Amino acid sequence: MASIDEGSRVERRFCAVGNHTLRKPYRQLNNKYLVRFACLLNSEIRAGNLICCKCYTDLVRLYRKKNDNAKRHKMARETAASITDVSGSQSSSHQSAPSLHVSGQSSEFGASYSEGGIVTPDEELCSHRSLSQDSDNVPTTSAAAIQKRQLARANLMVKPSQRLSLAQTTPDCDDYDPNSNLSLNAVNGTRLPHIQPIPKRRPTVLDKQSMDIYLMGTTGG
């Protein structure tokens, strides 16, 4: 009678993984990694639950397969990251090399240009002074030449950015027009179409009688 009760009690047990009754041989699920993986199949599995040996073997096989796939994906990600880092470092080195080449060329160009003779503001000022001294040594009686010389001296005393050319300051150049600032009305008597002429003032009548008549007509009495 006791054996019959024990057999019926064993038949009512279920495997912790599947929906079938527990079959012999069976064992307890104590590995924490397998328990964590088995919780993906059944969230109610706990450590120490009974499981069929065949189900345990299948669970271990699936866990190892999943672990191998995870390792393979991790290695692929690390390889892709290393390739990206190498390509980024190569591109940065390629970009830095032309910049160094260009800077070297610019420095060489600056050195050669300075050796070839670059005109500094001091040299330009000295050249202007020498030219002005040469022109001062030449005797002249022209008022335009004297004014031009004075403007050249004043131009040397200011900053290079504020200096004006002699063509803009001297009035004796070929492009100078004494009537350039005059309007058309002053030059040839013409006017623009939107500007009406100013009417002339009516002459004042000195005759008192005529003035009274005029005021009576304008003021009404």
From Swiss-Prot:
Indicate yes or no for the key word RNA-binding: no
Nucleus as a keyword of this entry, yes or no, is yes
Keywords on this record?
Chromosome, Nucleus, Telomere
Subunit details for this protein? Answer: Component of the HipHop-HOAP telomere-capping complex, composed of at least HipHop and cav/HOAP, and may include Su(var)205/HP1; HipHop and cav/HOAP, but not Su(var)205, are interdependent for their protein stability. Interacts (via N-terminus) with cav/HOAP and Su(var)205/HP1. The HipHop-HOAP complex recruits the MTV complex, consisting of moi/modigliani, tea and ver/verrocchio, to telomeres to form the terminin telomere-capping complex.
Region ranges (Disordered) = 69-113
Q: Which GO BP terms apply?
A: CENP-A containing chromatin assembly; protection from non-homologous end joining at telomere; telomere capping
User: What organism is listed for this UniProt entry?
Assistant: Drosophila melanogaster (Fruit fly)
Q: Name any GO cellular component annotation.
A: chromosome, telomeric region
Q: Which cysteines are joined by disulfide bonds?
A: none
Location of the protein in the cell: Nucleus; Chromosome; Chromosome, Telomere
Low complexity: compositionally biased ranges:
86-103
- Its primary localisation, in coarse terms, equals nucleus
Q: What does the function comment of this entry state? A: Part of the HipHop-HOAP complex that recruits the MTV complex to form the terminin telomere-capping complex, which binds to chromosome ends in a sequence-independent manner and prevents telomere fusion.
Q: Please identify the protein, giving its name as recorded.
A: HP1-HOAP-interacting protein
